[in-house]
Design a protein with these regions (language model features):
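Short coil/turn segments at secondary-structure boundaries
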Residues: 49-52, 56-59, 63, 91, ...
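Transmembrane helix-loop junctions and nearby membrane-interface residues
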Residues: 75, 79-82, 114-117, 173
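Amphipathic alpha-helical interface elements
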Residues: 84-124
Length: 250
């Protein structure tokens, strides 16, 4: 049976509940208990086993992905509400759509950092390795994970250029949004055209686009976790074996 088929029933939409992480959860819980005991003591270093540190590193990266997906759900909800607004505002739509574009590309970066954590890739001069370096490393070490990571990247690749334009050149726009914004800005006479209906239709299309992308990203990120499951199991089994050996000696 695949890992995907045995997802945890509680909040299945969260990547943190993916069955691929089950083998790491005891080690993460142990790490968190140790860290909790240090709260308020001024001590920052958590004395934990290698498996506990690994589990916390991986699971915290998964939590960052869940945070990003949660933000996309909020964006989709806001844009969906805007599509039903009595006074749809193109500027508000643009704001949310730009947020959507940034979040999509940000999730790709976070997926790469998850893979880096799973592969125990070290930081270089205090910074995490860049995406190209991570892809090169995982390609040589695990073809399945590499393919799954590229699938995540491909899902939102069409937003890479708009994201770069937002950062370096101009605000987001498309033909229909530009025309709509121009008509409203200049207060042109649009006799015979229901401007509000046109705006709502455009925003509804955007809401559907965001929902479709969100669903695809969630599935691809789940597939990435499943591809990494054997790596997680190796860590968990090694920790169990080490604990058993320690008990035998004692």
């Amino acid at each position: 049976m695949s890992v995907e088929a045995s997802k945890i029933e509680c909040c299945p939409e969260l990547l943190g509940n993916h069955a691929a992480l089950l083998c790491l959860l005891p080690h993460q819980r142990s790490y968190l208990h140790r860290a909790l005991a240090l709260v308020g003591t001024g001590t920052r270093l958590v004395k934990a086993s290698a498996a506990e540190v690994y589990a916390q590193s991986v699971c915290s990266r998964v939590a960052e992905l869940d945070n990003g997906l949660g933000s996309l759900r909020l964006v989709q909800r806001f844009v969906g509400a805007l599509a039903n607004d009595s006074d749809p505002d193109p500027d508000i739509y643009r704001y949310h759509y730009e947020n959507f574009v940034f979040r999509c590309i940000g999730l790709v970066d976070r997926a790469h950092l998850l893979v880096a954590a799973a592969l125990l890739m070290s930081k270089k001069r205090g910074n995490m390795p860049d995406n190209h370096l991570i892809e090169g490393q995982v390609k040589n070490r695990n073809a399945g994970v590499h393919a799954a990571l590229l699938e995540v990247k491909a899902t939102v690749q069409l937003y890479r250029r708009p994201r770069n334009e937002l950062v370096h050149a101009s605000a987001y726009s498309c033909r229909d949004l530009g025309v709509l914004g121009g008509v409203l800005y200049l207060d042109l006479n649009a006799e015979g055209v229901d401007i509000e209906a046109v705006a709502r239709a455009l925003f509804s299309e955007g809401s559907n686009e965001i929902a479709t992308t969100l669903e695809a990203l969630t599935l691809k990120l789940g597939a990435l976790l499943e591809a990494m499951h054997p790596m997680f199991e190796l860590v968990a089994k090694a920790a169990t074996k080490k604990a058993a050996s320690k008990e035998a000696v004692e």
